[in-house]
A protein has these predicted regions:
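Non-catalytic, conserved peripheral segments adjacent to functional cores
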Residues: 2-97, 114-115, 121-122, 126
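Well-ordered alpha/beta subsegment
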Residues: 94-99, 104-111
Length: 126
């Protein structure tokens, strides 16, 4: 069984953690993700999941023509990536970091904390 890894320590061959711009302000912090600048593709679609029931899983598929960048904008969850040869589990729990998922990588999201929000920036509108 794979174990979740801290994002600061991760250099994965299946997925890649990317730190986003972070502006710290006493009034509240701000992070930015720009296509072709912070992430390596143009963003065609943005979607998010929320109110995920305890024990539920999301994803459970791969995309043949679409890379995705997954961010835990609130709370935490795990993402399991599988390329058919290797599996790796990532704990996403910082709104200023995200996980780049390449084409043809199977992804499953689970272990959502209460109130977790998963934001996905997708390369294609599929």
């Amino acid at each position: 069984m794979s174990k979740a890894v801290r994002m600061e320590e991760t250099k994965a061959s299946i997925g890649k953690i990317i730190s986003l711009q972070k502006m710290v302000d006493p009034r509240g912090n701000l992070s930015i993700a720009e296509g072709m600048k912070d992430i390596p593709f143009n963003i065609s679609r943005v979607y998010w999941t929320y109110d995920v029931p305890s024990g539920a899983c999301r994803g459970g598929h791969a995309h043949k023509h679409c890379r995705e960048f997954i961010i835990a904008v609130s709370g935490s969850f795990t993402v399991t990536l599988d390329n058919g040869l290797n599996k790796q589990v990532f704990l996403l729990n910082h709104p200023y970091q995200g996980l780049l998922v390449e084409i043809d990588i199977w992804r499953t999201l689970d272990d959502f904390s209460s109130g977790a929000v998963c934001l996905v920036l997708a390369e294609d509108s599929f």
